A protein has these predicted regions:
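N-terminal pre-Walker A segment at the start of P-loop NTPase domains
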Residues: 1-8, 52, 62-63, 72-74
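Conserved P-loop NTPase motor cores
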Residues: 4-7, 16-39, 50-54, 102-218
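An amphipathic, basic-hydrophobic helix/alpha-beta surface used to engage anionic
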Residues: 45
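Conserved NTP-binding/hydrolysis module of P-loop NTPases
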Residues: 58-99
Length: 218
């Protein structure tokens, strides 16, 4: 599948998505979500969970780069957005530097093009002109966000910011030239609906893929 700038294997969902994995404890939802995230080829995962750091194997398999343990922190969603926005800023920085670098090299190899002295200083190091670098080689990073063990937390009971994130997840980290980085959200929950402290209707309505195991409900 191809969605925007992202490709996923034929048997995998398209990016970006909101995935709900629903099943009681020990049902296999963690294994299913881990396998799906690995299959889809994300560059790294942002984990939102008070228990994630205790599972090193999980952290290694999911290439977890950031962990938010305090699921009652009102600035949690803002922190996630900043990570993605910083990726957008860094990609724009790289693309701008690469454009200037190419112009500089053309000017150096030309007899008539003017040379920008600022760029001459910026790119010269170690007796050579160094090409700009970017962590993801000039492409948009593929980012997954995994929510686990958040039942009853302020993140779920005061969901205004989380609702907004689930609604515009594809548009987080907007780029000046158009498009955005975007993120895929994965929620691991024990019940699709619950009396209090679970995922609300707004997020459930944003669901694009559902992994459903046997639950306690008939």
């Amino acid at each position: 599948h191809t969605s925007g700038d992202y490709e996923t294997p034929p048997m995998a969902p398209k990016m970006h998505q909101v995935c709900l994995a629903v099943g009681k404890r020990q049902s296999g939802k963690s294994t299913a979500v881990i396998n799906l995230i690995e299959l889809m080829g994300f560059d790294y995962t942002i984990a939102v969970s008070p228990t994630m750091k205790s599972n090193k194997e999980l952290m290694d398999r999911l290439k977890i780069k950031h962990v938010f343990e305090n699921v009652d922190d009102p600035s949690l969603v803002d922190g996630i957005k900043k990570i993605v926005e910083d990726e957008a800023t860094d990609l724009e920085r790289y693309r701008d530097e690469l454009r200037r670098y190419r112009q500089l090299i053309r000017a150096i190899n030309s007899d008539h093009l003017p040379i920008d002295e600022g760029d001459l200083v910026s790119f010269y190091a170690d007796r050579d002109f160094l090409k700009p670098k970017h962590t993801w080689d000039g492409r948009k990073p593929k980012i997954a966000i995994l929510f686990d063990d958040c039942l009853g937390s302020d993140l779920y009971t005061k969901p205004r910011k989380l609702n907004a994130l689930s609604t515009y997840s594809r548009h987080v980290g907007q780029l000046k030239e158009g498009g955005s980085i975007g993120v895929s959200l994965f929620f691991m929950i024990q019940a699709f609906k619950c009396q209090a402290g679970g995922l609300n209707k707004v997020i459930r309505n944003q669901c694009t893929s559902l992994i459903l195991f046997k639950t306690k409900d008939n």
